[in-house]
UniProtKB/Swiss-Prot annotation:
Entries under Pfam families matching the protein: TetR_N
Keyword DNA-binding: yes
Regulation of catalytic or functional activity: Specifically binds to tetracycline, which leads to a conformational change in the structure of the protein and inhibits the DNA binding activity.
Swiss-Prot/TrEMBL domain comment: Contains an N-terminal DNA-binding domain and a C-terminal ligand binding pocket.
Molecular functions (GO terms): DNA-binding transcription factor activity; transcription cis-regulatory region binding
Keywords tagged on the record: DNA-binding, Repressor, Transcription, Transcription regulation
GO term, biological process aspect, one: regulation of DNA-templated transcription
Protein name per its UniProtKB record: HTH-type transcriptional repressor Rv3405c
Organism: Mycobacterium tuberculosis (strain ATCC 25618 / H37Rv)
Alphabetical list of Gene3D superfamilies matching this protein: Tetracycline Repressor, domain 2 (1.10.357.10)
UniProt xrefs under PROSITE patterns: HTH_TETR_1 (PS01081), HTH_TETR_2 (PS50977)
Length: 188
């Protein structure tokens, strides 16, 4: 039997909070890299340096873990948006959340059912509702604005090439997308 060096043992998470945090981090990284379907519970356990039984103990099924990762990313993004975090940190968090969402959706996971909380969407709805005569109008406006943002985040390289706007800088494109989102969120 081989024993692990002491340095490896020190890096292993201990205690409920550390173990849960390590599992969430590992699952988030792996889901962003390759998607939930291509990631096994054993992969997550190995990356987080815990026994795979602990993944089940802390999070239940893989579907529940996907939901926990999405909730974790939403909460983390909300905290960043309310902090003094630099724009590049927020941008990386948005990108990571978008990647996990896209991969989970493409893998066939029912993201809208697995994720329990949508704090950023709730805040946006609260801000937009007073501008609309109906709740449905506000909800549709927010859905359209999010779809536009997700579309650009995921398909920007293809959209730039297909429409001949490769020469726009990232900042110019971001301003244009933000202007379009603002128009969507304002009733006509």
């Amino acid at each position: 039997m081989t024993t692990r060096p002491a340095t490896d043992r020190r890096k292993m998470p201990t205690g409920r909070e550390e173990v849960a945090a390590a599992i969430l981090q590992a699952a988030t990284d792996l889901f962003a890299e390759r998607g939930p379907a291509a990631t096994s519970i054993r992969d997550i356990a190995a990356r987080s340096k815990v026994n795979h039984g602990l993944v089940f103990r802390h999070f239940g099924t893989k579907d529940q873990l996907v939901g926990a990762v999405l909730d974790h990313l939403g909460t983390k993004l909300t905290r960043l948006l309310h902090s003094e975090a630099p724009a590049d940190i927020i941008e990386r968090a948005l990108d990571r959340h978008g990647r996990v969402l896209a991969r989970a959706l493409l893998d066939g996971y029912p993201v809208g059912q697995l994720q329990q909380r949508f704090p950023n969407v709730a805040e946006l709805l609260d801000a937009v509702r007073p501008r609309y005569d109906s709740d449905l109008g506000a909800r549709l406006a927010v859905a359209h604005a999010l779809a536009l943002q997700f579309g650009w985040r995921l398909f920007a390289p293809m959209l730039r090439s297909a429409t001949g706007i490769d020469e726009l800088t990232g900042d110019e494109l971001r301003l244009s997308v933000n202007d379009a989102v603002a128009r969507i969120l304002e009733p006509h």
